[in-house]
């Protein structure tokens, strides 16, 4: 069901400060011990598809998304944050509603005297 296009409309699903223990990094010590990694994810979805509680294909389920990310980081060691982000993009874009994704991935506790270091990524459908 499409909403009437009287307004410019935007819908964003977000996950804020999800912290998971992840095998990530190029250094030998990073390959032996999981690190705390913080994820902040924003997903812009098609705002003109009306959410329907009887048809969950009309929404992006954030609980499902979190579970997929948890599974992704459990499966392997990531040498680079960039590789992890690309795999996250691939999973999130499987949902037909997704138009744009912003991901911020931060390694916590890795650099002395720093709360975190990381990278922000943005990808959108053309």
Role assignments for model-derived ranges:
Residues 1-126:
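N-terminal, polar/charged subdomain of small-to-medium soluble alpha/beta proteins
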